[in-house]
Amino acid sequence: MHCPDKESVYHIPVMLGECLEGLRIDPDGCYVDVTFGGGGHSRAIVEKLSSKGRLYGFDQDADACRNILQDERFTFVTSNFRYLANFMDYYGEDGVDGILADLGVSSHHFDEEERGFSFRSESPLLDMRMNARAGRNAAAILNEYDASSLSALFYHYGELKQARRFAASIVHYRESLSGGLQTVGQLLEAVRGLISPREEKKQLACIFQALRIEVNDELGALQQMLEAALGCLRSGGRLVVMTYHSLEDRMVKNVLRYGTVKAPDEDSLRLYGAPQSPWQQITRKPLTASTKELSDNPRSRSAKLRIAEKI
């Protein structure tokens, strides 16, 4: 595998101790870190394994291969975690003891300006693809979607107020550009008139989150991974998931409580009661970072950690 030569900088692992405790690691067990990134969580897991233990690390971003652990107990999988079940079958694993998912976007992605993940970047291109070899980028979406589609995107994936006005402004602005809307700077200019000085960071974060989710089909991939996790874990195996925004957290919470990403409607709950979940929730309420970690690692501020055990 060829890895880029640039120095790799990834975030400090969030709630590392809580994640390890949640996995309840058996030294001889088999574990999967479906969001390998900088390898911080994976390194800590491997340190707790015996010579018989195994760890798989998933990451679709080619940059992550710079951090591969040189350890015979570790296998790196260059793939989106939505294919978890496929690869566990490929490697002949008939059941794993724990699965860890840290769903946050790494500091590395925000710092790599040419990737276009941050509204603070000087990126020449609005890309936002986690997998640089994958389909369309953010610029393509901004140029191809009509105002109605962009509005729905910003509303549902960014939970952006005045989504229609922002979408209309983008469509109007892109029509004035001969080459279409391509850069972070052009996107900022397209919405400048609608940005509130008091809510600038929040509004821009909503727009960029919505685009990133759409470009990478993040919620679709998360649903597939959560559904696959149940089949991949042994009875008594642990699922440890860290979320960073309400859309992700709602899906994880529903899966652990009801067994599906969408909660039953009120009529169904009233008539039939809650369906039997295949998960025992170890954390009834999500864990959050300690005061010390919040001070040491600001990225942990929005993290919510949920832990469950397969029944």
From Swiss-Prot:
It holds the Pfam family Methyltransf_5. It catalyses: cytidine(1402) in 16S rRNA + S-adenosyl-L-methionine = N(4)-methylcytidine(1402) in 16S rRNA + S-adenosyl-L-homocysteine + H(+). SUPFAM superfamilies: Putative methyltransferase TM0872, insert domain, S-adenosyl-L-methionine-dependent methyltransferases. Specifically methylates the N4 position of cytidine in position 1402 (C1402) of 16S rRNA. NCBIfam families: 16S rRNA (cytosine(1402)-N(4))-methyltransferase RsmH. One of its GO terms (molecular function) is rRNA (cytosine-N4-)-methyltransferase activity. This is Ribosomal RNA small subunit methyltransferase H. One of its GO terms (cellular component) is cytoplasm. Signal peptide: none annotated.
